[in-house]
C-alpha cells in the first residue's frame, strides 16, 4: 500500500503500486439530471476496500470522468478517499491541452490524491516530442506522483516506447497503466525497470504479470475482486498454473464486460446485483438488462 499517499514527492524510495486497483464506477441517480449518487459511491468503495485491493482510481474511463463537472470530480475524489479509509486513491485527469489540464490537476491536488493518472492529450494527436513536453510539464508541477496512461484507442495518440523510456527518467513519473496493445512495447518498458507497469486491458492481466508487470487497473476488478487479487498473489509466488486457471475462469466474464462500451455492461451487472442504478450520462447509453443478466449468470459460474 502507498505510504503517506497525499504528501509531496520525497527523495526516498518510490511507493509501490503493486496489486489490483479498482477504477471505481461513478453511480448516477435515476433522476432528471442523472445526479451523482455519492451515497452509492461510498458504499461501493467501502465494499471493495475489504477485498484485498491495493487502492482505487477515481474519475478514470470507467468512472465516466468526461461526463462530470470539475466540482463533481472533486466531490467524487473526496467521497472515494473517505470511503477508502486509508487505502490510496489515484485521480484521473485528462484533456486536450496543457493549460486547462494543468489547472485542473493543481485544483484536484488540494483534495489529496495519492497520484494522478494522466493519458496523452486526446483528439489533437500530438507528436511524440509534444507528448514528452506535456507530461514533463505536468510531472514538474504535480505535488504527487504521476502515472502515465497509454490508451490510444480512446485518445487517438499512442505513446511510443522511446517516449515512455524518456519519460521514465523523470523523478515524479512512477508508472504506467498500459492499454497500448503492443506487447513488445510493454516488455521493453518492463525490462527497463524504471516504470511500474500496470495492466489496463482486462484480458491481458495474466500475461502482463508473467512478463513482470506489478499489477492492474481494470474495470473487471469490480467483479470477483478476490480472484483478481489472488491471481496477482499466485504470480508473485510463482504458482503460475493457479494464476492461469484463474485467468481462464474469468475470461468469459471479461468478454461480456466489454460486449458493449465500458462501463455500460459493468453498470448493468452492478444494477442487477442491486449496487447501483443502470444509469449512464449521455452520450453513453445503458447496456441492456439482458446483458446484465448474462453477466450475473457468467459470474455465478466462476
Predicted regions and their residues:
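A general structural signal for well-ordered alpha-helical segments in protein cores
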Residues: 41, 73, 77, 101, ...
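Catalytic alpha/beta core domains of metabolic enzymes, predominantly
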Residues: 140-141, 152-258
